[in-house]
Swiss-Prot record:
Binds 2 divalent ions per subunit. The ions interact primarily with the substrate. Changing residue 119 to N: Decrease of both AdoMet synthesis and AdoMet-activated tripolyphosphate hydrolysis. It comes from Escherichia coli (strain K12). K(+) binds at residue 43. This is S-adenosylmethionine synthase. It catalyses: L-methionine + ATP + H2O = S-adenosyl-L-methionine + phosphate + diphosphate. Belongs to the AdoMet synthase family. Mg(2+) binds at residue 17. Keywords: Acetylation, ATP-binding, Cobalt, Cytoplasm, Host-virus interaction, Magnesium, Manganese, Metal-binding, Nucleotide-binding, One-carbon metabolism, Potassium, Transferase. Its main location: cytoplasm. Changing residue 43 to Q: Nearly abolishes enzyme activity. Abolishes stimulation of enzyme activity by potassium. It holds the Pfam family S-AdoMet_synt_N.
Amino acid sequence: MAKHLFTSESVSEGHPDKIADQISDAVLDAILEQDPKARVACETYVKTGMVLVGGEITTSAWVDIEEITRNTVREIGYVHSDMGFDANSCAVLSAIGKQSPDINQGVDRADPLEQGAGDQGLMFGYATNETDVLMPAPITYAHRLVQRQAEVRKNGTLPWLRPDAKSQVTFQYDDGKIVGIDAVVLSTQHSEEIDQKSLQEAVMEEIIKPILPAEWLTSATKFFINPTGRFVIGGPMGDCGLTGRKIIVDTYGGMARHGGGAFSGKDPSKVDRSAAYAARYVAKNIVAAGLADRCEIQVSYAIGVAEPTSIMVETFGTEKVPSEQLTLLVREFFDLRPYGLIQMLDLLHPIYKETAAYGHFGREHFPWEKTDKAQLLRDAAGLK
């Protein structure tokens, strides 16, 4: 592959779909705090003046879903009716059932290690050495832009900003290496009083320049800041939001494949979530060990069965040891059975709400971002 462009996007915590994701994961965290063995599948729908929380939850815990919802919306920043959505006055509806006993009998086992997968499915994990966090650069910097938007909105640097925002970054590659940034898009909701020129200048100086490395920006880099000219109506007033609709933003920005399953609102018995985290952990440790420059892991499951139905390692020709050896190393050093990976990554804790905005991968404090097996893999592979 010679010269090419690659684009990834992200959305802020105030985007309607991300509001829904954060509410679903806030409910999950509140339940796990009381009942780590709970079964949770929590879906959220948001629209002007309304939040609907539904799903299947089996737990001994009691949580106040209305209070959790209002607090989450309040933390995001929707606290006044002039934003079209207000944590203090929106209606909160709840439609929660219990997990089907047919599913439950396939998951629970007397021996925890034999815990079956909560569903069939395929999951991918990915890592690349093109950034310090072993993530693709386009999605990494797209996330950082909208994180910065939230930071300068909340700390009062740009008080006319509102919670809804989107970013998009197009990188230039030459023979697989980054040579620059071709285009940057940043659209942010704002209050009525700010004019377009002032907004564009402030966004450039306070959001874009502090985040994007200067060596990747040239006179040819194109910037599109609120290109429609106005973004006052946003959030759930502009679009309805739904849990699980930003699965590419949540993962690798399109740089790696995706099995199709969303993450937010699901407890770790759901392999859609936990096995995708484990696959990232495996891929990141392989790259951190220097066994490959890029690595994609696929793992698949059958409902009610503990052992994965398949494990695949793809290194795109960048491997330093034979691919067959990599697969054997994965099977030796990583327990990818549902209970095994829950234990390996210590997933039965309320750690999920923070994952629900700005990406599930690439932030070092999450347990699946550890590289604690890199040296073991390197030694076992015989690399000096």
